[in-house]
Amino acid sequence: MADYLVRAIGAGGNVRAFAAVTTALTEEARRRHDTWPVATAALGRALTGTALLAATLKDPNESLTLRVAGDGPLRGILCDADEQGHVRGYVTEPHVDLEPAARGKLNVGAAVGTGMLYVTRQLALQGIYTGSSELVSGEIAEDLAYYLTRSEQTPSAVGLGVRVGPDGAVVAAGGYMVQLLPATPDADRDRLEENLGRLGSVSLAVEQGMTPEEILSVVLTGIDYQILERRDLSFPCRCSRERALGAIALLDETELSGLVEEGRGAELTCHFCNAVYRFSPEEVLQVQRGMKDKQ
């Protein structure tokens, strides 16, 4: 199944619901960053949560960044996404191994630790807005739900899951987000709570072959709703050799001269996708000459 999300509205416009399958992009992140299982689970949940949050963006030029700043051994997670379904991210320390939590689950909460969650929206008309809240569990889904309720004043339920196989590869990943407006009837609130309990593990649902539409059909059982959009999801990266060369041009004259004189050239690694760009001393010298010509 290809990765995608769906966006729906229900209960007379009082309920907004989103569901996504993110197995392929989470596996791509695992492959690029060589993450160990608990880091894979944490990064996959963060990528999925970022994709769901970005589904609220309305302009092709808008983007959203999620930063999980915890004091656990993962040392933080950073993800971003745009309105077109492009999602990317990385974990600071990909090689973390912890004892499993209860029932043998990967201990994402301990790996993330305590700290803060930051969401930055770059909007077409309103500019840049950053909200934040404390991490309540480090499990990502609970932290996002708390953030949305506390910082954005939108009561929300969030479910995120990643199932990792014995070989470390991603078997299934996905999630949902349900947001309630103030006028949501109490009966619909109760029904949603019951439905979410019936859905259970979202990663198990994806592993069993449920599509985003089918996940929403369970979450919104008994509530009139309409699917408004389907959005493909992928893990591309905007880095390029040209952008890396531009980063070298930001070095000062002394640093550039040192790279040329030592004959080492330069090497840059993209944090988001782990791509490595290498430049010879001659290429660095050309950058240096170009800077002098502009002076």
UniProtKB/Swiss-Prot annotation:
Record's subcellular location: Cytoplasm
Signal sequence region: none
Pfam families assigned to the protein according to its UniProt record, in alphabetical order: HSP33
Cellular-component GO terms for this entry: cytoplasm
Keywords for this protein: Chaperone, Cytoplasm, Disulfide bond, Redox-active center, Zinc
Post-translational modification: Under oxidizing conditions two disulfide bonds are formed involving the reactive cysteines. Under reducing conditions zinc is bound to the reactive cysteines and the protein is inactive.
InterPro entries reported for this sequence: Heat_shock_Hsp33, Heat_shock_Hsp33_C, Heat_shock_Hsp33_N
Family matches, as Gene3D superfamilies: Hsp33 domain, HSP33 redox switch-like
SUPFAM superfamilies documented for this protein: Hsp33 domain, HSP33 redox switch-like
Record flagged with keyword Zinc: yes
A GO MF label: unfolded protein binding
GO biological process: protein refolding
Cysteine disulfide links: C237-C239, C270-C273
Family (UniProt): Belongs to the HSP33 family.
UniProt xrefs under PANTHER family: 33 KDA CHAPERONIN
NCBIfam families referenced in this protein's UniProt entry, alphabetically: PRK00114.1 (NF001033)
HAMAP family the record matches: HslO (MF_00117)
Role: Redox regulated molecular chaperone. Protects both thermally unfolding and oxidatively damaged proteins from irreversible aggregation. Plays an important role in the bacterial defense system toward oxidative stress.
Protein name listed in UniProt: 33 kDa chaperonin
Organism: Symbiobacterium thermophilum (strain DSM 24528 / JCM 14929 / IAM 14863 / T)
